[in-house]
C-alpha cells in the first residue's frame, strides 16, 4: 500500500522522472485490511470508511487483469514500472543502488516502504498446520482451512486475533484463543476499556484462555506453558508484526530499537534522498510529543503524500507529517474505530454503557481530547477526529452524555 501510494502521489505532484515500484510479492499491490476483516469470511462484507471501494475489493482485484489493482491504480497509465516478486536484499547508499537478488537498481531518490513482517513463534515456520496472516498468499492458504470448519487455535487476542476469531467462528470452526497476558488487547488499550471485550469471545462461542503461554507449536496443536496440550487442525499465530528492515543492516540507515526506520518530520531518513513510509517507519509527532510507529492502513495511505511532496518540490516548506492516527476493526458483530493516541490521556470519559452494543470512550489531557474509541458510534469517531485535529477542549459532563453530539461538548 505505502509504496503504491507513493508512486501515485509522485505523479500527482507532477514528478516527471522514472518511477519503479519494487515488491517482494508476485501480486500487484492490494489492500491488506480485507485479509483479516473480510477476505477469510464466507461472505466478504463491509467497507473501509476511509478508503474508496469495498473492503473486499483489494484482494479480489489483486489477482485481476494486469494494469488494474484493488487499489484502483492503473500503473501503466501512470508510467510506473512494476518489479514484482523481487525482494530488496541490501542498500548500497554510497553507490545509490538497491540490490534485489542479482539485480542492482540505481536511484536518485529512494522510498523505503517494506512494511512489517508477522511475528511468529519458535518453530512455527516449519511446523505443518501453523499459519500467520500478513499477505494474500497467507490468506489463500488459510481460507480452505477455515472453510472446512475444523478446530482452530488462535495465538494472540489483539486486533488481528479478534478478527481471525470472528472469521473462524462465522465459518463454523470451534475456536480456542490463547493470550499470554491477562486480557484481550492488553498491549493496545487500558484494562478498564478492554474489560467488556473478553465477553465478546464468549458471546461468539469462542474459548478464551488468558494468562496462558504457548511453550511450543506442534503438528496438530500447541503445547502450553503448564504442560497441557490443545489439539487443533490449524494454529494461527497473531501476536503482532515487526518492521521489515533487516535488509538495511550496514546501509547507514538509522534504525530505532524496535527495528523501525528512524524518519524525521518529513519522513526523511539519516541518508540523503532516502525516505521511509508506512509500517516500517517511525516519526516524531509534535502533536503527541513522542515518536510514533503506526501499523495501520491510514498511516500507509497518508504518509506517501508527504514524501512525494518533498521529493517533487525539494523545499523545506513542504508540510510535516503529524497525523491523527486512525484505524478500524470489525469483530464479533461490532464496528470499532479509534482515532488519536491515548498514552498521554489523564482522564477517561465514557459515552454510553460499555456493556451495550454501542458506546465510546474519550481520553482527555488537560481537558483536551487526545484519543477516542468508538464502538458502533461512527458519528462520535468522525466528530472526535476533527476535534483532536484542532486540539479542542471538551466539557467532560456534556461529553459523557451520549445523547449530546460530541462536537457540542467542545468549549
Role assignments for model-derived ranges:
Residues 66-68, 151, 159-215, 323-327:
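Rossmann-like dinucleotide-binding cores of NAD(P)H-dependent redox enzymes
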Residues 1-2, 24, 134, 155-158:
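Glycine-rich Rossmann-fold phosphate-binding loop(s) that bind the pyrophosphate
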Residues 280-378:
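Mid-to-C-terminal Rossmann-like scaffold of FAD/NAD(P)H-dependent oxidoreductases
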Residues 228-256, 333-411:
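C-terminal catalytic lobe of FAD-dependent flavoproteins
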Residues 51-59, 68-151, 223, 236-238, ...:
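FAD-binding core/adjacent interface of flavoenzyme oxidoreductases
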Residues 84-86, 92-93, 134, 179, ...:
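Short loop/edge segments at beta-strand edges and connector loops
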Residues 126-149, 221-223, 229-301, 306:
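FAD-site-proximal beta/loop scaffold in flavoenzymes
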Residues 1-81, 167-188:
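Beta1-alpha1 glycine-rich phosphate/pyrophosphate-binding loop at the start
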